[in-house]
Amino acid sequence: DANADVTTAWAMMEEHGIRHIPVTQGDIVLGVVSERDLWRAQAEGRDDIDMGGLVSTIPFIVEWSASLADVARAMGTRKIGSAVVLRDGKLAGILTTTDVCVYLAEVLEEHYHSPNTDDAA
């Protein structure tokens, strides 16, 4: 919600174990606020700012049916930390670079049967 404050955003992130939250106004996605955005707001003494005030860029939005490879490539090329995922025009979730890394690790393990060692790069 665009009217939520920094404290509410922190609580939501902690409750759900996430580092990005969508900022919406009704059914419209205004953007994404990250943990880093909240740290910056607090460091600047802007604890009273609402989430709508923290959103500064147009979100990277993809449809549910988009290819993960295409989305991940676009995120990497554009240096974007998250993508807002819509399903039939409605917010379905957020895909983060962390999500992509976890999936990549699973695929690599499945296909290459990587030994589980501490010697990893």
Predicted regions and their residues:
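A short beta-loop-alpha structural element at the N-terminal edge
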Residues: 1-4, 63-64
